Amino acid sequence: SLSDKDKAAVKALWSKIGKSADAIGNDALSRMIVVYPQTKTYFSHWPSVTPGHPDIKAHGKKVMGGLAIAVSKINDLKAGLSNLSQQHAYKLRVDPANFKILNHCILVVISTMFPKNFTPQAHVSLNKFLSGVALALAQRYR
């Protein structure tokens, strides 16, 4: 679980990266689709899954908007992300293993875009936070 120190580190990092959330989301989602091509199946209704395509940009923005909600609900991720969990489980039917894949891509993008802010402590805290988000999103699958 997230310690107070982790929560503070996530909030501090988010305050620095939040303005670039759309670019982070686009790059992370584009990266996921290229590096893990099996994830393309969730986006087969799009005309293209080429990195940077407007649909990828729009969904990357949605993903990062969801993470912004998670940061604001950091003290109770399960309750804060309940609606998103329901949507991903029942409407979108996303395999929860893909949350971990996207989390990894988000970490990679943040580390390359914000190397000075992505300290080892920020990395640990953000990784724990993203793992908590993945668990909260997977809660409706049980």
From Swiss-Prot:
Q: How does it assemble?
A: Hb1 is a heterotetramer of two alpha-2 chains and two beta chains.
Q: Name one GO molecular function term.
A: organic acid binding
GO CC annotations on file: blood microparticle; haptoglobin-hemoglobin complex; hemoglobin complex
Entry binding sites for O2: 59
Task performed by this protein: Involved in oxygen transport from gills to the various peripheral tissues.
Tissues where the protein occurs: Red blood cells.
Q: Which residues bind heme b?
A: 88
Q: Which PROSITE patterns match?
A: GLOBIN
- Give the sites modified to N-acetylserine: 1
UniProt superkingdom: Eukaryota
Q: Which family does it belong to?
A: Belongs to the globin family.
Is 4Fe-4S set as a keyword in this record? Answer: no
Kindly list the biological process annotations in GO that this record carries: hydrogen peroxide catabolic process
| UniProt feature coiled coil, ranges | none
| Gene assigned in the entry | hba1
Residue ranges of domain Globin in the record: 1-142
Q: What UniProt keywords apply to this chain's record, in alphabetical order?
A: Acetylation, Heme, Iron, Metal-binding, Oxygen transport, Transport
Q: Does the keyword Metal-binding apply?
A: yes
Misc. comment: This fish has two hemoglobins: Hb1 and Hb2.
Q: Which organism is it from?
A: Notothenia neglecta (Yellowbelly rockcod)
The name on file for this protein is: Hemoglobin subunit alpha-1
